[in-house]
UniProtKB/Swiss-Prot annotation:
The modification Phosphoserine is found at S267. It is a single-pass membrane protein. It is found in: Membrane. It comes from Homo sapiens. This is cTAGE family member 2. GO terms for biological process: endoplasmic reticulum to Golgi vesicle-mediated transport; protein secretion; vesicle cargo loading. Residues 538-558 have a biased composition (Basic and acidic residues). The chain crosses the membrane at residues 13-30. Belongs to the cTAGE family. Residues 84-254, 290-411 form a coiled coil. Residues 512-521 have a biased composition (Low complexity). Its main location: membrane.
Length: 745
């Protein structure tokens, strides 16, 4: 060999063979690697399917949670519309909703991250899917070759089926002929049964006719006997007629005796008597003979009819005998035909047995051929099933990828939708929070105005009391009546909380009817007079909400002063001097301008204020008097642009404090003057006689200094009661020196 004929000392043939073998080895390794990766890909797909199912379940759970939160939020909105004072609950629910929104946002971010990961995996799977499409093309070519083979097998099976159908057609023809023979045989049997039944019917008819014949024969014998008797009677009558010919001459002489003859013709027993007297009964005998002739004629007619009937019976008897003979001949012919058909049936059954044997032999031959063909077909079907499994697996993968892509799109849409909903709910929560804040501000302003108005009311009531004591002292300066010098007691700052006072104003719709505090005698309000009454305490216990429950309510805010205290005592916590000393001028803030002045004259007492001027809020639907509506409208106009309705004010803000304990008055009052109802308050003249002065009943009741509740101040909450009970000690009951004397008229 030449040195240039082979590279590096190896011949070219070995190099080419090694290259070809290496190429095939690389192809084999690549194919095995692809099969392994496809199996790993299936496992990954299962894992991804499990992960997706878990994510979908989590999504469903989140949707359920979100629906529950949405329902709670809707219920919260309804409750907020129904209860204007439940703002703290809305704040807590808004915080919970914000927390849930934060959780949902976190979960959405996690889901977005998972979606990105799944999109990357989808891209990888698409690249793998393109490779699988190439494999599918190769598989489709193999499927076409297998389909050609299956077509050839189907043609062979069709030929076998054609031969099988021919045998089936021959078998069906034989079965049809046999069925026709069976039908003819059954018809003949039915006709035979019918003929036998007809023969039985005819036999019954013949027996009946024989009975009729016997009866007719008996009647014939009886008729013959009757005829013989009649003939004998006729003979006797003829003999007597011959004897009567001799006495014809005597008939003319005895015409006068006709009346006697009519009486003697009723019975045949008198015939002998007429014969003994021929001249008298000759005519009657002739008449009797005529009657006998007529009866004989009738008997002859009956005899002729009987003869006719007998002849007809003989004719029917002959016809029946002929019909019975015909039926017997038909029965014999039918029996011969039946034997002929039975012989034919036996022949056909023998033919059928032979044909079935031939059919079974042909069937066995065809069955053997079919078994061989089915084996070949099963082998080819196994190959086709493997290919179909590959195709179905690939199609399932395609469908799963498409479904996943659709689920991802839907999931993105739901995420955007819920993000929009979360933004809307956040806006609603912010709006609710701002509305609650504005409502709280309005409530605080209204509380201040209410306290100021109540202070005015206390001053007016104090003036009314003084006017009741001294009806002619009308011009009384305002500065002469300090809180410490008032007969109603000390400053309202030292009163107990609004929860322990008797309510002057009517309660709200949520609170129920008016109730009095059990801690004070006779309710402890302005209208209480005299010592306490134990049944009042029992009446207050009938309420569903007791004063103890209200005192221990943790949702109420603390108050620095009672609801009747002026606004400067609510806004500023000041140190007040002990009772008996005057207030410094520098400590008092400037007073507000009076915003509520009533057109009242002298009132007969605080009880009338409570009974006439304070209508119940439970009757706000038209039962409020016009004077009160005008006064309420005036107060609303003076309160500015506040849009909080009067019914939303808590009932405890409209209650009077128990600090104003008036001195007990006379149990029997004097006559009252006529009532003037033109103003918002009831106008009356001065009472007659005037009550005794207040100094007669002893000194004013003492009070204890206020005590602040330890701890930080609590935020106000818009409930039925705005203020929490303070830690004040209750007042001691009034100690009258003696009861006043009854006025005399």
């Amino acid at each position: 060999m030449r040195p240039d004929s082979h590279p590096y000392g190896f011949p070219w043939e070995l190099v080419i063979r090694a290259a070809v073998a290496g190429f095939f080895a690389v192809l084999f390794l690549w194919r095995s690697f692809r099969s392994v990766t496809s199996r790993l890909y299936v496992r990954r797909e299962k894992k991804f399917a499990v992960a997706l199912s878990g994510l979908i379940e989590e999504k469903c759970k989140l949707l359920e949670k979100f629906s529950l939160v949405q329902k709670e939020y809707e219920g919260y909105e309804v409750e907020s519309s129904l209860k204007n004072a439940s703002f703290e609950k809305e704040a807590t629910e808004a915080q919970s909703l914000e927390a849930t929104c934060e959780k949902l946002n976190r979960f959405n971010s996690e889901l977005v991250h998972e979606i990105l990961c799944l999109e990357k995996e989808l891209k990888e799977e698409k690249s793998k899917h393109s490779e699988q499409n190439e494999l599918m093309a190769d598989i489709s070519k193999r499927i076409q070759s297998l389909e050609d083979e299956s077509k050839s097998l189907k043609s062979q099976v069709a030929e076998a089926k054609m031969t099988f159908k021919r045998f089936q057609a021959n078998e069906e023809r034989l079965e049809i002929e046999i069925q026709d023979a069976w039908k003819e045989n059954s018809e003949l049997q039915e006709s035979q049964k019918q003929l036998l039944q007809e023969a039985e019917v005819w036999k019954e008819q013949v027996s009946e006719l024989i009975k009729q014949k016997r009866t007719f024969e008996d009647s014939k014998v009886h008729a013959e006997q009757v005829l013989n008797d009649k003939e004998n009677h006729i003979k006797t009558l003829t003999e007597r007629l011959l004897k009567m010919k001799d006495g014809v001459a005597m008939l003319e002489e005895d015409v006068t005796d006709d009346d006697n003859l009519e009486l003697e013709m009723n019975s045949e027993s008198e015939d002998g008597a007429y014969l003994d007297n021929p001249p008298k009964g000759a005519l009657k005998k002739l008449i009797h003979a005529a009657k006998l002739n007529a009866s004989l004629k009738t008997l002859e007619g009956e005899r002729n009819q009987i003869y006719i009937q007998l002849s007809e019976v003989d004719k029917t008897k002959e016809e029946l005998t002929e019909h019975i003979k015909n039926l017997q001949t038909e029965q014999a012919s039918l029996q011969s035909e039946n034997t002929h058909f039975e012989s034919e049936n036996q022949k056909l059954q023998q033919k059928l047995k032979v044909m079935t044997e031939l059919y079974q032999e042909n069937e066995m031959k065809l069955y053997r051929k079919l078994i061989v063909e089915e084996k070949c077909r099963l082998e080819k079907e196994e190959k086709l099933s493997k290919v179909d499994e590959m195709i179905s697996h690939a199609t399932e993968e395609l469908e799963t990828y498409r479904k996943r892509a659709k689920d991802l799109k839907e999931f993105e849409k739901t995420i955007h939708f819920y993000q929009k909903k979360i933004i809307l709910h956040e806006k609603k929560a912010h709006d609710n929070w701002s509305a609650a804040w504005t409502a709280e501000r309005n409530l605080n302003d209204l509380r201040k105005e209410n306290a100021h108005n109540r202070q005015k009311l206390t001053e007016i009531e104090f003036k009314i009391k003084l006017l009741e004591k001294d009806p002619y002292g009308l011009d009384v300066p305002n500065t002469a009546f300090g809180r410490q010098h008032s007969p109603y007691g000390p400053s309202p700052l030292g009163w107990p909380s609004s929860e322990t006072r008797a309510s002057l104003y009517p309660p709200t719709l949520l609170e129920g009817p008016l109730r009095l505090s059990p801690l004070l005698p006779r309710g402890g309000g302005r209208g209480s007079r005299g010592p306490g009454n134990p049944p009042d305490h029992q009446i207050t216990k009938e309420r569903g909400e007791s004063s103890c429950d209200r005192l221990t309510d943790p949702h109420r805010a603390p108050s620095d002063a009672g609801p009747l205290a002026p606004p400067w005592e609510q806004d500023y916590r000041m140190m007040f001097p002990p009772p008996g000393q005057s207030y410094p001028d520098s400590a008092l803030p400037p007073q507000r301008q009076d915003r509520f002045y009533s057109n009242c004259a002298r009132l007969s007492g605080p009880a009338e204020l409570r009974s006439f001027n304070m209508p119940s809020l439970d009757k706000m639907d038209g039962s409020m008097p016009s004077e009160m509506e005008s006064s309420r409208n005036d107060t609303k106009d003076n309160l500015g642009n506040l849009k909080v309705p009067d019914s939303s004010l808590p009932a405890e803000n409209e209650a009077t404090g128990p600090g104003f304990v008036p001195p007990p008055l006379a149990p029997i009052r004097g006559l009252l003057f006529p009532v003037d109802t033109r103003g918002p308050f009831i106008r009356r003249g001065p009472p007659f006689p005037p009550p005794p002065p207040g100094t007669v009943f002893g000194a004013s009741p003492d009070y204890f200094s206020p005590r602040d509740v330890p701890g930080p101040p609590r935020a106000p909450f818009a409930m039925r009661n705005v203020y929490l009970p303070r830690g004040f000690l209750p007042y001691r009951p009034p100690r009258p020196a003696f009861f006043p004397p009854a006025p005399t008229f």
